[in-house]
């Protein structure tokens, strides 16, 4: 059937707007290897402090070779167009196939659509992509672009002739994928005759329209699943019977996928997937595909799953919690080297454990990105329990260790990420411990003996510890990367041959957990983060720091994917690691006063952090951090209320409008444009001035289900969980999203100049939300002639937020430039709070 004979999805397409409906072919992928060679460079703590939009400057040899061969040259399509699926925009202007590739991989894809022109005429099309692309109109090639600068968008205008009636538009786009790849194109209809987009579909046009509306509006019936049945709600009945395939995946490093298939009848209004108790824990992506005949439509949703009922309350003693943590990981985590570590720590060798290790060895043998995450727990386990492994597996492990690439100065052709602090620690730890295991063998890439490799690794570990002890982490407060740092440090604390290194590593572990405790609200880290992802922001109970809090302080839950938990447990059980007892009380603040915690992180103290908490609320921000700059994965403000981990709010400027995407920044993780941020106690201000070309709104994560009471009215939003209360005030209307995945979860503030004022309090002082609103609804900020923002607060009086981040309030002066790496925690009286009476 030709395109002219089929039904069509027809959409108005205005001038100066993107063309967003397409048919796609299969994604072509081909491994791209170049000759092994060393690479210049060193650890770069500030790699994410981007200078040109979101461009990361480090270039691998494979990219250099690729550009030498293909930059400026016409891309070469690998096949003819054959439609296998239909792309629906869901508010994204791009056709976005971004993802994560662990080895250098050439990728390419065809896309096709039709522009139905009212009259013939000349038109201008603007093509944007990060890789290469060719544009065809009615079968005639109009030109190409091929900058191939990794993850940096380029644009090119094309003048084309449109005929009256349908005009076929084809785009072939390709690139070299290295780790996180921004693989997309955007085609804008800049100028020309009046047109509409017209995409052929093999079912009735009205049914195709209805299926798009259902995919656009579908959502989970809960914000998080803690044992309940998982249900996806449709906004309208299905117009036709269809097949539904769902792939449930974890984060981009997860090795597991769970597939479900359903047959849905016409008229269905929901999809019941079964109990979440039988599904894998963690934040999970549900990749949903509807198929009706040859029509294939899909989108991705995401939600947290946790199993608190099975896990129960944490044991009372540390010894029992250590045993519980090891047993939980051994029985319920992903089958990787971390799970194998926990099993070996419990004396569980044998076929199942060896199968886990064997399945992960290709990652190390082929130097996949993040192979260092896999290798370090394996080296720790091999050091302690190699006698539980078969001779054949030990030989294979030895071969993998000897052939691995431990640093960029060794020859290789991989795209392992050597630059961040957490990866650098793991590479150096692996070289140090791996060399010790095989002292007389030759490490192939460096040509060193194991003894020599150990010496080099030791020098680099010492240098890394020097840097950490002076500056700590540029990736401050990062929920995903604290466990990675702990993965390396626990291996050193247990296995380092040198006692000084063991002691320094142990002290560093304690320091990291002090930071977590100071920044935690009832055990859950709450505050600004240097690097964050949607899959580590949205969940609370199932992130690994929750499990670590359960291990150390008896409050938290387990997820499925872990990095450091069993290593930390073994360090406590077998290697004398101890934590100050007072950290438990700090992590779960219960007193009548408040804790104010100011500290700096990163080389030259570039990240100045402010945190304030009471037993009812916690709020953390970063002070005077690159206001107005393009952001990366920085979360600048984060708060929690009451005792429920899901009762959290953060505010950001989305880096992209596609939800559940791979952008850095993404829809929820990080900021496209960083705001000016100020905080004093439980009062904060965010001022956004958004760059052109970026999404024209800011938004707040505001999950109604997680709160006990809410009000959203005009420019005000109030929420209560337990005794904690939050008020958000916008400089425009705060619009609740009522359609799609973020229904009753997202508040949007339209405009490029968005101001949010955040004020927290508690039920004891305000009585209810009406009382909170009566006291604080008129809060506003005015700018004085020197650029300071001034707020008159009912409790704190005149609060002055100066442009350099200095705060003046209540006779105090807080200067972020003075905040030390070690930090200062002070206890402050809470205005209007009455001390709790002891039970009589």
Give short role names for the model-derived ranges.
Residues 418-466, 471:
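Active-site cradle of extracellular carbohydrate-active enzymes
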Residues 103-115:
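Short beta-strands within extracellular/lumenal beta-sheet-rich domains
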Residues 117, 121-136, 169:
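Aromatic-lined ligand-binding clefts that engage carbohydrates, nucleic acids, or primary amines
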Residues 208-422, 456-460, 555-840:
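Ser/Thr/Asn(+Pro)-rich, low-complexity disordered segments
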Residues 490, 499, 503-566:
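Extended amphipathic alpha-helical segments with heptad-repeat/coiled-coil character used for oligomerization
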Residues 1-90, 172-211:
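Accessory carbohydrate-binding/adhesion or oligomerization-edge regions at the termini
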């Amino acid at each position: 059937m030709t395109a002219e004979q089929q039904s069509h999805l027809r959409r108005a397409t205005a001038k100066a707007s993107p063309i967003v409906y397409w048919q796609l072919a299969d994604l072509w992928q081909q491994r791209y290897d170049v000759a092994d060679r060393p690479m210049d460079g060193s650890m770069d703590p500030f790699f994410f402090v981007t200078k040109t939009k979101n461009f990361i400057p480090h270039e691998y040899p494979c990219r250099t070779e690729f550009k030498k061969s293909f930059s400026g040259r016409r891309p070469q399509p690998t096949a003819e167009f054959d439609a296998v699926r239909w792309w629906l925009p869901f508010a994204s202007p791009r056709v976005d196939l971004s993802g994560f590739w662990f080895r250098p991989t050439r990728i390419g894809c065809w896309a096709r659509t039709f522009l139905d022109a009212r009259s013939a005429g000349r038109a201008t099309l603007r093509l944007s992509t990060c890789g290469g692309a060719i544009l065809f109109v009615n079968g005639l090639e109009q030109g190409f672009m091929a900058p191939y600068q990794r993850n940096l968008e380029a644009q090119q205008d094309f003048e084309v002739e449109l005929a009256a009636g349908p005009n076929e538009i084809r785009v072939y786009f390709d690139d070299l994928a290295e780790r996180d790849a921004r693989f997309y194109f955007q085609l804008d209809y800049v100028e020309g005759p009046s047109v509409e987009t017209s995409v052929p579909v093999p079912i009735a046009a009205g049914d195709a329209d209805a299926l798009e509306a259902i995919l656009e509006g579908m959502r989970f019936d809960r914000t998080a699943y803690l044992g309940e049945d998982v249900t996806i709600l449709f906004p309208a009945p299905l117009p036709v019977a269809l097949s539904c395939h769902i792939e449930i995946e974890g984060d981009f490093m997860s090795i597991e996928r769970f597939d479900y298939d359903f047959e849905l009848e016409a008229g269905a209004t929901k999809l019941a997937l079964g109990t979440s108790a039988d599904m894998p824990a963690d934040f999970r992506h549900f990749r949903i595909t509807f198929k009706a005949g040859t029509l294939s439509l899909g989108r991705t949703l995401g939600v947290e799953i946790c199993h608190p009922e099975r896990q129960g309350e944490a044991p009372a003693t540390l010894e029992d919690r250590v045993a519980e943590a090891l047993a939980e990981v051994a029985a319920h985590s992903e089958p990787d080297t971390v799970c194998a570590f926990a099993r070996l720590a419990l004396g569980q060798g044998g076929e199942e454990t060896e199968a886990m290790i064997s399945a992960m060895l290709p990652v190390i043998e082929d130097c996949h990105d993040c192979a260092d995450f896999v290798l370090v727990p394996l080296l720790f386990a091999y050091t302690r329990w190699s006698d539980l492994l078969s001779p054949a597996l030990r030989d294979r492990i030895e071969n993998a260790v000897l052939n691995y690439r431990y640093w960029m100065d060794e020859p290789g052709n991989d795209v392992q990420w050597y630059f961040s602090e957490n990866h650098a620690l793991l590479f150096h730890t692996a070289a140090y411990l791996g060399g010790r295991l095989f002292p007389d063998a030759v490490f192939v890439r460096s040509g060193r003996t194991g003894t020599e490799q150990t010496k080099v690794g030791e020098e680099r570990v010492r240098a890394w510890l020097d840097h950490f002890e002076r500056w700590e982490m540029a990736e401050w407060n990062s929920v995903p990367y604290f466990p990675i740092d702990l993965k390396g440090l626990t291996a050193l604390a247990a296995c380092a041959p040198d006692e000084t290194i063991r002691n320094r590593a142990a002290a560093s572990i304690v320091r990291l957990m002090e930071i977590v405790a100071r920044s935690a609200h009832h055990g859950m880290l709450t505050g600004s983060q240097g690097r964050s992802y949607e899959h580590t922001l949205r969940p609370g109970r199932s992130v690994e720091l929750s499990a670590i809090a359960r291990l150390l302080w008896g409050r938290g839950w387990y997820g499925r994917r872990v990095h450091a938990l069993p290593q930390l447990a073994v360090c406590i059980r077998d290697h004398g690691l101890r934590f100050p007892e007072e950290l438990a009380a700090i992590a779960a603040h219960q007193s009548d006063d408040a804790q104010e915690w100011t500290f700096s992180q990163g080389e030259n103290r570039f990240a100045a952090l402010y945190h304030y908490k009471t037993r009812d609320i916690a709020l953390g921000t970063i002070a005077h951090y690159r206001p107005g700059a393009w952001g990366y994965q920085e979360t600048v403000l984060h708060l929690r209320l009451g005792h429920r981990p899901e009762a959290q709010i953060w505010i950001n400027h989305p880096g992209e409008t596609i939800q559940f995407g791979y952008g850095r920044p993404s829809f929820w993780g990080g900021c496209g444009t960083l705001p000016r941020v100020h905080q004093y106690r439980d009062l904060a201000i965010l001022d956004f001035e958004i760059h052109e070309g970026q999404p024209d709104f800011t938004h707040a994560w505001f999950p109604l289900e997680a709160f006990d009471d809410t009000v959203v009215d005009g420019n005000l939003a109030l929420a209560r969980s337990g005794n904690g209360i939050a008020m958000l005030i916008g400089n425009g209307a705060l619009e609740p999203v009522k359609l799609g995945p973020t229904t009753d979860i997202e508040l949007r503030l339209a405009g490029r100049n968005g101001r949010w004022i955040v004020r927290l309090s508690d039920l004891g002082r305000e009585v209810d939300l009406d009382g909170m609103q009566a006291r604080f609804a008129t809060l506003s900020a005015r700018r004085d002639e020197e650029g300071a923002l001034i707020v008159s607060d009912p409790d704190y009086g005149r609060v002055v937020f100066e442009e350099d981040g200095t705060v003046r309030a209540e006779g105090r002066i807080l200067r972020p430039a003075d905040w030390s790496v070690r930090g200062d925690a002070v206890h402050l009286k809470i205005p209007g709070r009455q001390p709790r009476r002891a039970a009589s």
